[in-house]
Amino acid sequence: MSHSVKIYDTCIGCTQCVRACPTDVLEMIPWDGCKAKQIASAPRTEDCVGCKRCESACPTDFLSVRVYLGPETTRSMALSY
């Protein structure tokens, strides 16, 4: 699958998205931009299955982590209706 995972600077460093990801796409890295001194990172986006559990787990209401599904997934979702 070809999905894009974006982490935004609204991340509060809580690790909820990292713990929610079933395929270990996300990890925490050092960052001085928030109190937690860490931010989520997505070094393994090729393993993303598009489940969006990271988005659901994020306490900032999807403002910090977003999964953009690839065209093949979006197309198959439309066909299932």
Curated annotation (Swiss-Prot):
One of its GO terms (cellular component) is chloroplast thylakoid membrane. It is found in: Plastid, Chloroplast thylakoid membrane. [4Fe-4S] cluster 2 binds at residues 21, 48, 51, 54. Its cofactor is [4Fe-4S] cluster. Residues 2-31, 39-68 form the 4Fe-4S ferredoxin-type domain. It catalyses: reduced [plastocyanin] + hnu + oxidized [2Fe-2S]-[ferredoxin] = oxidized [plastocyanin] + reduced [2Fe-2S]-[ferredoxin]. It comes from the Eukaryota. GO terms for molecular function: 4 iron, 4 sulfur cluster binding; electron transfer activity; metal ion binding; oxidoreductase activity. It is an enzyme of class 1 (oxidoreductase). The keyword Cytoplasm does not apply. Binds 2 [4Fe-4S] clusters. Cluster 2 is most probably the spectroscopically characterized electron acceptor FA and cluster 1 is most probably FB. One of its GO terms (biological process) is photosynthetic electron transport in photosystem I. [4Fe-4S] cluster 1 binds at residues 11, 14, 17, 58. Gene3D superfamilies: 3.30.70.20. Keywords: 4Fe-4S, Chloroplast, Electron transport, Iron, Iron-sulfur, Membrane, Metal-binding, Oxidoreductase, Photosynthesis, Photosystem I, Plastid, Repeat, Thylakoid, Transport. It is a peripheral membrane protein. Its EC number is 1.97.1.12. The eukaryotic PSI reaction center is composed of at least 11 subunits. Apoprotein for the two 4Fe-4S centers FA and FB of photosystem I (PSI); essential for photochemical activity. FB is the terminal electron acceptor of PSI, donating electrons to ferredoxin. The C-terminus interacts with PsaA/B/D and helps assemble the protein into the PSI complex. Required for binding of PsaD and PsaE to PSI. PSI is a plastocyanin-ferredoxin oxidoreductase, converting photonic excitation into a charge separation, which transfers an electron from the donor P700 chlorophyll pair to the spectroscopically characterized acceptors A0, A1, FX, FA and FB in turn. PANTHER family: PHOTOSYSTEM I IRON-SULFUR CENTER, PHOTOSYSTEM I IRON-SULFUR CENTER-RELATED. This is Photosystem I iron-sulfur center.
